[in-house]
């Protein structure tokens, strides 16, 4: 029986880690998909930066272009918005001087409001790209245990919030030349800064043997 093997491009940057202030439109990198095969997935992460509820949900657009250059042919492929933005988040600081890559737990100044299943955002402002999203498994007083080990170590004292959001958006690249992500906190002002990062995984080729 023949087996088809797909060759993929992993983690192409749609939007580098960006602090998206209220009342702004943030436009990510235009990714050339002219030679890609059909299926692709956009992976989008949003982290809260304050405990306050947002004034409005954050809006997202995946856009496609029929041209190899220029800005006059971008059209929406798919639009969505955050789910928990208008709910107040739990926010505290990391109180763990030995929070290292590979750790499966860390200590907070206050564990109040952090519960099992929470999507947690550890916000690095010195080197924003070192920020990290993780999922809580349990909380005991001020110690949070997470489902998977941390990828990076984290700076003691950084802000930590819950109610982060993760999205995986399937898209067919076969009818597009370029794809990009737009984060819109202007059409309906979010009132607060949110941090967003996004990647695209595409299929480059398929071989059957």
Predicted regions span which residues?
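Terminal beta-strand-rich extracellular "head" domains
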Residues: 58-88
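Tryptophan-centered short beta-strand motifs
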Residues: 24, 30, 70-80, 130-133
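Noncatalytic modules at the cell exterior or secretory-pathway interfaces
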Residues: 38-44, 171-192
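Extended, low-complexity, turn-rich repeat/linker tracts enriched in Gly/Pro/Ser/Thr and Asp/Glu
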Residues: 46-57, 68, 128-129, 185-192
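C-terminal interaction-tip segments
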Residues: 1-17, 36, 183-209
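Small/polar beta-strand repeat architecture
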Residues: 84-104, 109-118, 123-173, 183-188
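Contiguous beta-strand segments within globular domains
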Residues: 26-47
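Short beta-strand/loop motifs in extracellular/secreted proteins, especially
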Residues: 40, 56-60, 118-120, 132, ...
